[in-house]
């Protein structure tokens, strides 16, 4: 009788361990939508002309760990406005994919570019506040931005 129970329980235990092993790494993984928000959203502030803005933000948002991210853009608009871009003008992404969308109106952004000669761990960025249309890649359910593709001057 005890042998019968162990024959049933052993495969069940193996299945439970496999499921836990598969699910556990994804529990701590940041979703693409959350990563987009961490790397690109700064709704609570206006574009800064402070030369230290990008240096501070890139470090604060964990984009200088292990290497210096060469280019990044922060968007200074409400998250809902950026999410709504996913339902605006459809455009082709830089990589050829077809899930990119361009904002109907210009948005306040700050471009951060690694300065020439800057090397990890001393990442130094040039800060450029701008007003431009943004292009984002969207996916998921709900359909939300997961990648900042570009910013453009005009709407054409």
From Swiss-Prot:
Catalytic activity, EC: 4.6.1.18
SMART domains reported for this sequence: RNAse_Pc (SM00092)
First and last residue of the signal peptide: 1-28
Any matching Pfam family: RnaseA
Subcellular location: Secreted
PROSITE patterns: RNASE_PANCREATIC
Sites carrying sugar chains: 62, 116
GO cellular-component term (any): extracellular region
Superkingdom to which the source organism belongs: Eukaryota
GO MF annotation: an example: lyase activity
Residues annotated as the enzyme's active site: 40, 147
Chain residue ranges for the region called Disordered: 31-52
UniProt keyword annotation of Signal present: yes
Chain's role: Endonuclease that catalyzes the cleavage of RNA on the 3' side of pyrimidine nucleotides. Acts on single-stranded and double-stranded RNA.
Family: Belongs to the pancreatic ribonuclease family.
Protein known as: Ribonuclease pancreatic
Species for this entry: Pygathrix nemaeus (Red-shanked douc langur)
